[in-house]
């Protein structure tokens, strides 16, 4: 890599080690098809990445965020926990209301169905129709 290019980047990214990480990440992005923001001039991807950082066509902060996201194995999703807390309340009033709210099913309570009710329900089910593929 050209020493002049590295020296041009030091005032943009103060830490040389961070500069190497960011330029390497950008070079990998370029080799995978990311669009160039400067002319290539027959330079290789690491030199082009350093020139992009030196010319400030790519901000080091954006590169740093992209590098962090590319290295993450688990992406944390921010979900509001304040809404989940009232649902988990174990008050007696909430426990009494929950079993009664069965939605559109009416009086049916699946957790209290007897074996005879289950067998009666299975007998009322229509058998599946036979298709041409199954007849072979």
UniProtKB/Swiss-Prot annotation:
Residues 83-99 have a biased composition (Low complexity). GO terms for cellular component: DNA-directed RNA polymerase complex. It catalyses: RNA(n) + a ribonucleoside 5'-triphosphate = RNA(n+1) + diphosphate. SUPFAM superfamilies: RPB6/omega subunit-like (SSF63562). Signal peptide: none annotated. Its EC number is 2.7.7.6. Promotes RNA polymerase assembly. Latches the N- and C-terminal regions of the beta' subunit thereby facilitating its interaction with the beta and alpha subunits. This is DNA-directed RNA polymerase subunit omega. It comes from Methylobacterium nodulans (strain LMG 21967 / CNCM I-2342 / ORS 2060). The lineage of its organism: Bacteria, Pseudomonadati, Pseudomonadota, Alphaproteobacteria, Hyphomicrobiales. The gene is rpoZ.
């Amino acid at each position: 890599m050209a020493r002049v290019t590295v020296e041009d980047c030091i005032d943009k990214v103060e830490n040389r080690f961070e500069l190497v990480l960011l330029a390497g990440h950008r070079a990998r992005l370029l080799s995978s098809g990311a669009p160039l923001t400067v002319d290539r001039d027959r330079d290789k991807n690491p030199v082009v990445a350093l020139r992009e950082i030196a010319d400030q066509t790519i901000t080091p902060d954006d590169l740093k965020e992209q590098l962090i996201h590319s290295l993450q194995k688990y992406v944390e999703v921010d979900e509001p926990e304040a809404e989940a807390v009232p649902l988990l309340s174990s008050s007696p009033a909430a426990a009494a209301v929950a079993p009664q709210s069965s939605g559109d099913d009416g009086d049916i309570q699946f957790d209290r169905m007897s074996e005879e009710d289950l067998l009666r329900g299975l007998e009322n089910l229509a058998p599946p129709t036979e298709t041409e593929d199954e007849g072979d």
